[in-house]
A protein has these predicted regions:
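Cleavable N-terminal export/targeting peptides
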Residues: 1-26
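Outer-membrane beta-barrel translocator domains and adjoining extracellular loop/strand segments
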Residues: 42-49, 95-104, 147-158, 200-208
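Short glycine/proline- and aromatic-enriched beta-strand/turn motifs that initiate or cap beta-hairpins
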Residues: 21-73, 227-229
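Gram-negative (and chloroplast) outer-membrane scaffold detector with strong preference
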Residues: 27, 40, 73-152, 217-230
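Transmembrane beta-barrel strand/turn architecture of Gram-negative outer membrane proteins
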Residues: 119-121, 169-179
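Short sequence motifs at beta-strands and strand-loop junctions characteristic
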Residues: 62-68, 112-117, 163-170, 214-219
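Predominantly the C-terminal beta-signal and adjacent terminal strand-loop region
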Residues: 93-97, 182-230
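Extracellular loop and loop/strand-boundary signature of outer-membrane beta-barrel proteins
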Residues: 56-60, 103-111, 155-163, 208-214
Length: 230
């Protein structure tokens, strides 16, 4: 659904007739809209790495749900064709679930977490500044800050009382397009891929037992919204 919405938005931008001049060196762009993180999660099996059962492989895989929040972009045009951009958003929330382990009691919700994915990118706009339609590509670096972790029902039922996950650094890529409705107002559609790798842990502090799972979150991120140029 998200891919279809993004594609339709780009097509609508592409066929519209130019009405206003687009980006120039020194412009400041602010965009806001609905942003969806869709994890393409792959993971290791669940392993006990601390306590009397250390080294035990429980099998299984981790999954994360999608979430939609308010997305924000702040960009500065270094030249007519090159800009620097910061992605921000309100916190995303995900449930980390486990399925397929050798112990049925271990399957289910491992924990929940929130995260912020600030991403700094260099963005290239190939078309002339006079074009109202401005497709672009970009690449940059992401820092995913994970916080507000809570142990899940499946983990707590097995005596685990703590859940946490590591923050992540990774590369990010994006494609998108602006279409100028006026000299200042634009509509925008964009999609990103971000390399997010984390390790989630659950602890049974009373018994000194810990289990972990490595997760390649690697989400596709879709955003559609409006922007304003200063």
């Amino acid at each position: 659904m998200y891919k279809s919405l993004f594609t339709a938005s780009l097509l609508a931008l592409a066929i519209a007739a130019p009405v206003a001049q687009a980006h120039q060196a020194g412009d400041i762009l602010i965009r806001a809209g609905a942003i969806t993180v869709n994890p393409e999660a792959d993971s290791s099996s669940v392993k006990v790495d601390r306590g009397g059962l250390a080294g035990t492989d429980l099998g299984g895989k981790a999954t994360l749900n999608s979430d939609t929040q308010l997305g924000l972009n702040f960009a500065y045009m270094l030249t007519d064709n090159l800009g620097i951009e910061l992605l921000a958003a309100t916190p995303f929330e995900h449930d980390v679930k486990i399925k397929g382990t050798v112990l049925d009691a271990a399957n289910g919700k491992l924990g929940s977490l929130k995260h912020l994915p600030p991403t700094l990118s260099l963005v290239y706009y190939p078309l002339d500044a006079k074009s109202a339609f401005q497709p672009y590509v970009g690449a940059g670096i992401n820092y995913t800050w994970i916080f507000d972790e809570h142990v899940g029902s499946a983990a707590s039922a097995n005596g685990f009382n703590n859940f946490r996950a590591k923050n992540s650094w990774g590369l990010a890529w994006q494609v998108g397009a602006d279409y100028m409705l006026t000299d200042s107002l634009m509509i925008n559609a964009q999609v990103r891929y971000i390399d997010i790798d984390t390790t989630a842990y659950v602890d049974n502090t009373a018994l000194g037992v810990r289990a972990k799972v490595d997760v390649d979150v690697d989400p596709l991120i879709y955003m559609v919204g409006l922007g304003y140029k200063f």
